[in-house]
Amino acid sequence: MTDPAPAVTGKPLRWLQLDGLVLLASALILFAATHQPWWLVPAVILLPDLFMLGYLRGTQVGAAVYNLGHAYPLPAAMSLAGAVWHHPLTLALGLLWLAHIGMDRLARYGLKYDVSFQHTHLGGPHPKETDARLPSDRAA
């Protein structure tokens, strides 16, 4: 298992949240350009969370599967494939997948460590200040 690093806090966290907001907004603007129906947004925006099912096999498998669905490479490749092959639905679905990731980052949900679902590179949705301290900083 991997020991989680301290949670990102302060200005770096705000920059990472801004990254998420920019990704979310950009993906939705590009989605609009695909001329796909807007009902797709609520229909599929949460589908990447199905990658949480990996946790049924334990925290190590769960973190790996979850991170596979919540990192940029797969949805970026899907979006690129849709654009290159002139397949608007594939492009739209890839963009909505990226929008989901942006939404998660904005809400402070990050990539998972394999110690538990709550330990992320962003410290979870509401990290406590004590989570941000290094183990050596904690009183013994």
Label every PLM stretch briefly:
Residues 1-140:
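N-terminal membrane-targeting hydrophobic helices
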